[in-house]
């Protein structure tokens, strides 16, 4: 069974002189694991989530929304062992759907 790892972040790291780093401020506010073969949805993201880190162990297709359904070859694609960051709207009850 394929796995999508989701890490939710509310803030980015702020470095010296107020410079924003391109990494999430640890600890994350939530983490999810979604197992899938056909289209499967995550739970709704935390209301404070601003961006998510996605990592998959297999080639997959994904889409975001309040009630998303991922479709092979038409939704966004992640390659096996790829890690990706995506911004999401605050307080939108967004989820990610994923399929092989």
Regions found by a protein language model. Give the residues of each.
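Surface-exposed ligand/attachment interfaces on beta-rich extracellular proteins
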Residues: 18-48
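Short tyrosine-centred short linear motifs in exposed loops/low-complexity segments
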Residues: 38, 60, 92-94
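Short, surface-exposed beta-strand/strand-loop-strand elements in extracellular ectodomains
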Residues: 55-73
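Hydrophobic beta-strand residues in large extracellular and virion-surface proteins
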Residues: 4-6, 34, 54, 62, ...
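Short, intrinsically disordered N-terminal pre-domain segments
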Residues: 1-28, 99-100
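Short linear motifs in intrinsically disordered
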Residues: 43, 53-54
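Noncatalytic modules at the cell exterior or secretory-pathway interfaces
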Residues: 49-52, 87-100
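Short, solvent-exposed S/T- and G/P-enriched segments that are highly enriched in secreted/extracellular
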Residues: 36-41, 72-89
